[in-house]
Amino acid sequence: MKEVINSLNYLSNWPSAGSFEFNTNILETNIINISVVLGVLVYFGKGVLSNLLDNRKSKILNTIQNSEELCKGATDQLEKARARLWEVEKRVDEIRVNGYLQIEQEKENLIKAASANLKQLEDSKNETIFFEQQKVIDQVRQQISYQALQKALAIMNNCLNTDLHLRMIDYNIGRLRAKKPN
């Protein structure tokens, strides 16, 4: 770019040779002067412009290449993340299913344990009731036996006299002797 400006300055300071000169006033410039200036600009600016465009092109290509590499890396990371997400979701589903199964199993175990405890309590209750019934029955038997014995003794004492009492004793002693082996 500097070369173009220097060339234009050089041409503008060139001494005029009669009818040919550079008109620096843009409003008074004619088509020939403009075409000469454009020709000079194209001639001298071609290399600079070409270099600028080549540099810009290489920067754009590098940027595109870097972007493509970043995109590929991001795509790879996305695929890895999706694979990891799939594994995590699968593991979560397994944990959820195992958790539900374990909850159901614990529930069944608790129900079985509660049923066993209830049966054990029922058996214990029945045993206690049976024991208490037997105890009451034994007490009633004892009381009935005692009352019957008391009644029998009272009847005997009222009905028996001494003579009958002695005969009864002798009779029972005779029976006992008959049963006794010699």
Swiss-Prot record:
Cellular compartments annotated: Plastid, Chloroplast thylakoid membrane
Subunit structure: F-type ATPases have 2 components, F(1) - the catalytic core - and F(0) - the membrane proton channel. F(1) has five subunits: alpha(3), beta(3), gamma(1), delta(1), epsilon(1). F(0) has four main subunits: a(1), b(1), b'(1) and c(10-14). The alpha and beta chains form an alternating ring which encloses part of the gamma chain. F(1) is attached to F(0) by a central stalk formed by the gamma and epsilon chains, while a peripheral stalk is formed by the delta, b and b' chains.
Protein's recorded name: ATP synthase subunit b, chloroplastic
Comment field (misc): In plastids the F-type ATPase is also known as CF(1)CF(0).
UniProt entry keywords in alphabetical sequence: ATP synthesis, CF(0), Chloroplast, Hydrogen ion transport, Ion transport, Membrane, Plastid, Thylakoid, Transmembrane, Transmembrane helix, Transport
Membrane topology, as annotated: Single-pass membrane protein
Transmembrane portions of the chain: 31-53
